Amino acid sequence: MTSQSQNIVETPSRVRAHALGINAPELAQYQDEPAQMRSGAVGKSGYLKLRFAKREHRSILAEMERRVPSMVQKALYWDEEMPELPCVTMISTSGCILQGDRLATDVIVEAGACAHVTTQSATKVHMMNANYASQIQNFTVEEGGYLEFMPDPLIPHRNSRFITDTTINIHPTATAIYSEVLMSGRKYHHADERFGFDVYSSRVAAHVFLGKEQPAGKELFVEKYVLEPKSESLDAIGVMQSFDAFGNVILLTPKQHHERILARVPAHFDIKGGIASGATRLPNDCGLVFKALGIDSAGVKNEIRQFWKIAREEILGVTLPEKFLWR
């Protein structure tokens, strides 16, 4: 057994990343291996572990483990509204997601700690002629913890296939904001790029955190959607209609915050302005879900930022810092 194989076997999330998609019906016809480099080979089996812990005056990135192509910058404290908040930017040394990639991420926020995790830019899923790419994301937020996971959009290129599975284990007193933005593709690059991908499969689930080394507790909710635009048009009313960007935000937080947040987030539909958004409750009183549609990423990101701002203000009593010009 190679050192890479040994490391994969010893890391449950990496094992899941390599297995994810093998038995997925939506990927049944994409099990062929790439001619260049086999799936999950060295450089194609990325792993990132981030563990945040509370110290006297602030939280810190206490542990970081990575395997190429995944890496992160050091924790920075650029949020002037929350100077105790470590902000970490995830980076891919390959610059994109390629066919045969198997990626896994573990983020742990210990009791009383806080963290903000983002990406340096949009994530591109490149064109594929064999196999697919898979991603496992595990988030654990312990008692009184606070996590913001706010990556930039994901852009699936023509003929790409991508499957992602996200699990959030959260203590009843903790808060987690999980965001994702999906684009229709590189619609200005080529006529066949808009909804030109083969498969985009996403599953997000949450469980009650029972403690370290303990199995996951009660399942709070599961959301899964499989997009196959070449089989069924996404331009239908009730799906994407004329929109090109989809934003999905999961807010898991104690019940006492829900009503105040919802009162400040009315449904918004402006077909001329190219934006639609709204929020509702998740099952088991575990939190809220916010969704937005737009003609471009800027509009959707603005809607998400407003929801994020309201959530922060109602939960923590602090707002967001001024938006960076380059973001």
Curated annotation (Swiss-Prot):
Compartments, record wording: Cytoplasm
Keyword Chaperone: yes
Record keyword Transmembrane helix present: no
Disulfide-bonded cysteines: none
MF-aspect GO terms: nickel cation binding
Keywords: Chaperone, Cytoplasm, Nickel insertion
InterPro entries the UniProt entry points to: UreD (IPR002669)
Family, per entry: Belongs to the UreD family.
Protein function: Required for maturation of urease via the functional incorporation of the urease nickel metallocenter.
Subunit structure comment from the entry: UreD, UreF and UreG form a complex that acts as a GTP-hydrolysis-dependent molecular chaperone, activating the urease apoprotein by helping to assemble the nickel containing metallocenter of UreC. The UreE protein probably delivers the nickel.
HAMAP family the UniProt entry points to: UreD
Protein's UniProt name: Urease accessory protein UreD
